[in-house]
């Protein structure tokens, strides 16, 4: 919300519609009367709607109002959890210990709430045998099915086999799909 509102002497309209500090309508008053009312209450006269005729002004503590607005904005930013996509790169002929390390790494990403993009890179003639890459990616998906579900099935994209695993279980995915289907019906 923009905090560049006109307050007190910055308001130039000759007559304004005034709202009291507790929200009651005080009617249309001259700017001098409205400023006197605000001064008596030891508060500010703030123009909240300048495009109406006459402009709407509210008697309030402007400093407290500004503080509340910035606090709400900060809280809403904190509440938003941004899901990042982390990538784990594999090769079709990866050794078991290296594979287990990659599974642990992907598991840590998913447990933190991030999506994991599993990509199996083919080099040279490895592309002639894409089934080896499919086996590795399927093993990775099976190793992570207790903490995440496959959001996009493995598909070949150039020289890479790519799959995305999202946090949650298959049950949560089915619930989300069910709710989404009900929303589309309505």
From Swiss-Prot:
Instruction: Enumerate the InterPro entries for this protein.
Output: T_IF-3_C_sf, T_IF-3_N_sf, Translation_initiation_fac3_CS, Translation_initiation_fac_3, Translation_initiation_fac_3_C, Translation_initiation_fac_3_N
Q: Could you tell me which SUPFAM superfamilies the record lists for this protein?
A: Translation initiation factor IF3, C-terminal domain, Translation initiation factor IF3, N-terminal domain
A GO molecular function held by the record: ribosome binding
Location in the cell: Cytoplasm
Q: Which UniProt keywords apply?
A: Cytoplasm, Initiation factor, Protein biosynthesis
GO cellular component terms attached to this protein's record: cytosol; membrane
**Pfam families assigned to the protein according to its UniProt record, in alphabetical order:** IF3_C (PF00707), IF3_N (PF05198)
| Gene Ontology terms describing biological process | ribosome disassembly
| Oligomeric and partner information | Monomer.
Tell me, what does this protein do in biology? Answer: IF-3 binds to the 30S ribosomal subunit and shifts the equilibrium between 70S ribosomes and their 50S and 30S subunits in favor of the free subunits, thus enhancing the availability of 30S subunits on which protein synthesis initiation begins.
Entry similarity comment:
Belongs to the IF-3 family.
Which protein is depicted?
A: Translation initiation factor IF-3
Per the UniProt record, the source organism is Chlamydia muridarum (strain MoPn / Nigg)
Give me the gene this protein comes from.
Answer: infC
């Amino acid at each position: 919300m923009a905090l560049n509102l006109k307050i007190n002497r910055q308001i130039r309209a000759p007559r304004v519609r005034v709202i009291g500090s507790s929200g009651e309508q005080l009617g249309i008053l001259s700017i001098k009367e409205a400023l006197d009312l605000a001064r008596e209450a030891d508060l500010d006269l703030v123009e909240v709607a300048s495009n109406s005729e006459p402009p709407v002004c509210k008697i309030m503590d402007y400093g407290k109002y500004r503080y509340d607005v910035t606090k709400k904005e900060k809280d809403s930013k904190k509440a938003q959890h941004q899901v990042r996509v982390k990538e784990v790169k594999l090769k079709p002929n990866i050794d078991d210990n290296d594979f287990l390390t990659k599974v642990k790494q992907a598991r840590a990403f998913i447990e933190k709430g991030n999506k994991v993009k599993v990509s199996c890179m083919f080099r040279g003639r490895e592309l002639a045998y894409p089934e080896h890459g499919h086996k590795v990616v399927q093993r990775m998906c099976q190793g992570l099915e207790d903490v995440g579900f496959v959001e996009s099935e493995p598909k070949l994209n150039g020289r890479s086999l790519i799959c995305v695993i999202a946090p949650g279980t298959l049950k949560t995915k089915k619930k989300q799909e069910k709710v989404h289907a009900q929303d589309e019906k309505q």
